[in-house]
Amino acid sequence: MHIEERIHIAVPPMVIDHIWSDIDRWHLWDPDTKQARLNGPFAVGTRGRITPSKGMGVPMVVRERTEGRSFTVEGYIPLFRMHFEHTVSPAVGGSDVAHRVWFTGALAFLFGPGVAKQVREGLPRTMRSLKAYAEQRHEPLNSDA
């Protein structure tokens, strides 16, 4: 089960990457995140914790990181893993941003549907919030120039 949401944001990809890299401030643009932190650099293998606005915090680990392009974090509890992939690519007038979410593990069949429902409801709001956050803090690119 994969969930994906896309949006165009009128800022360069490096602006989005800079926002993503500031993990302690994820809650400023992601209404479904109460707190996030890493115990080290924003790099593959670094562990941390993410606490959703509703629910308990879970450990997370950075599984993929390509500066200026993408990152994937994995939240986990025993026998259930939540994968959150984020990509940004250059586009006319700014950037195309995609967030993908999927679940693995022996208990994915049990926890996946409930978590998927929350993600499907929240992800469009999160993407709109990221767009507003990025464009309010950085001058949007004018595609007419």
Residue ranges and their predicted role:
Residues 54-56, 64-70, 79:
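Short, charged/polar surface micro-motifs in flexible loops or helix N-caps
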Residues 13, 63-68, 87-96:
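A short, structured loop/turn motif at beta-sheet edges
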